Regions:
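N- or domain-start disorder-to-order transition segments that initiate the globular core
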Residues: 1-31
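Structural motif corresponding to the C-terminal cap of alpha-helices
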Residues: 27-34, 188-192
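Short active-site oxyanion
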Residues: 40-43, 200
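Short glycine-rich phosphate-binding loop at a beta-alpha junction
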Residues: 43-48, 204
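Basic/charged alpha-beta structural segments of nucleotide/phosphate-handling enzymes
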Residues: 46-196, 211, 218, 224-225, ...
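Conserved P-loop NTPase "ATPase switch" module shared by AAA+ and STAND
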Residues: 197-209
Length: 258
């Protein structure tokens, strides 16, 4: 599908474009002169079920043709390369486990928070764990943060952080979905570096806002037949805007930061 090049294949669509429609049109155009089975060899990785359904609907609208293999980011962990990675625990089970641990902490330290906040605290810790695992940030890195005059509040927060630490590193607890996804991406990156897929792999619709997804995008972009298609890319951003993105404190939430 792609001619050999020395640069990474990174494409983008501008804000306001009908991303699935333009994506399908581009794939069809690139395969006009190729054998019918060429499109069926393509693996198209997208980040939401809604986009996957829309892409499939656009192909189903005709004309009849062989279709690419459409996968979600989370489907990548279902292949033989990652069969030995344990399945992730359900989000509900993890929240119930966190609720029990938070309850025990509040029993020992009743001044930390009211009992009525038990479930909210468990939800907050679950969200924190997802973000930490998605970014590859261990609890030790957060514990070492210099928070200055917030030391009293921070000391209380660290007691809750110790609960999160229970689920990091070697433990008897099952993997969270984010932790498993990171292991899957690390495994695929290693396998692909040794034996790259011969067929095209296209990751479309992701910006790399999560660390795990960014790592996957980097791995795909390095493949001989890999490509990225970015959504909502601002091709008109001035040079000064690109310079501003180098400041993580002010630009981290920008979709083109990474």
């Amino acid at each position: 599908m792609f001619e050999p090049v020395t640069k990474l294949r990174v494409f983008g669509l501008p804000p306001g474009a009908d991303f699935p429609k333009v994506l399908v049109a581009g794939l069809v155009e690139r395969h006009k002169t190729l054998p019918p089975e060429a499109l069926a060899r393509v693996t198209l990785v997208v980040n939401t079920r809604r986009m996957a359904r829309r892409i499939r609907a656009l192909f189903d609208a005709g004309p009849a043709r062989l279709l690419p293999k459409i996968q979600l980011l989370t489907d990548l962990g279902k292949g033989p390369e990652t069969a030995d990675i344990p399945a992730a625990v359900s989000p509900l089970q993890r929240r119930l486990e966190l609720t029990q641990l938070v309850s025990g902490l509040l029993d020992r330290e009743p001044d930390l928070a009211p009992r009525a906040a038990l479930y909210d605290l468990a939800d907050s810790l679950a969200s924190l764990m997802d973000e930490m695992q998605g970014e590859g940030v261990p609890p030790e890195a957060i514990a070492k943060l210099d928070v200055g005059d917030q030391s009293g509040h921070w000391a209380r927060s660290l007691q809750f952080l110790q609960i999160v630490q229970t689920f990091f590193g070697p433990s008897d607890h099952a993997l969270d979905a984010e932790a498993r996804q990171r292991l899957v991406v690390e495994r695929l990156a290693k396998v692909w570096a040794a034996t790259p897929p011969a067929a095209p792999v296209i990751l479309a619709g992701s910006t790399g806002s999560r660390g795990t997804t960014l790592a996957l995008m980097q791995a795909v972009a390095q493949l001989p037949q890999g490509a990225l298609i970015l959504p909502g890319f601002d091709f008109e951003m001035p040079v000064s805007g690109w310079h501003d993105l180098s400041n993580a404190m002010t630009a981290e939430d920008h979709p083109q930061f990474r």
